[in-house]
């Protein structure tokens, strides 16, 4: 018999058949700037000092007629003042 017995030599072997699969490089994670936590008091207090208490802002005066701030629309000519 003159033909080769292994059938692999009949297929055409190209250098592309032995090529390793190409893996795309992994994308870099997004860059977040470091977050600096506020520095704790060095001797750890179990109770931190109370934050300052801010009184709520006083409400603007309420004028029941139109043209002023307050009810019934307020502003210049706003609302349906009675």
Curated annotation (Swiss-Prot):
Propeptide ranges are 1-19
Its gene name is cotT
Compartment(s) where it occurs, according to its Swiss-Prot or TrEMBL record: Spore coat
The protein's UniProt keywords, in alphabetical order, are: Sporulation
Q: Give the protein's function.
A: Inner spore coat protein which seems to play a role in germination.
Q: What else is known?
A: Present in an increased level in yabG mutant spores.
Q: What is this protein called?
A: Spore coat protein T
What is the source species? Bacillus subtilis (strain 168)
Keyword Electron transport in the entry? The reply is no
Q: Principal localization?
A: other
**According to the lineage, what is the superkingdom?**
Bacteria
Entry keyword annotation includes S-adenosyl-L-methionine:
no
Which GO BP terms, alphabetically? Answer: sporulation resulting in formation of a cellular spore
């Amino acid at each position: 018999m003159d033909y080769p017995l292994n059938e692999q030599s009949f297929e055409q072997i190209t250098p592309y058949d032995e090529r390793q699969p190409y893996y795309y490089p992994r994308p870099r994670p997004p860059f977040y700037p470091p977050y600096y936590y506020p520095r704790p008091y060095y001797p750890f207090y179990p109770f931190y000092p109370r934050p300052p208490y801010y009184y709520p802002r006083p409400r603007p005066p309420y004028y029941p007629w139109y043209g002023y701030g307050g009810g019934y629309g307020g502003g210049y000519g706003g609302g349906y003042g009675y």
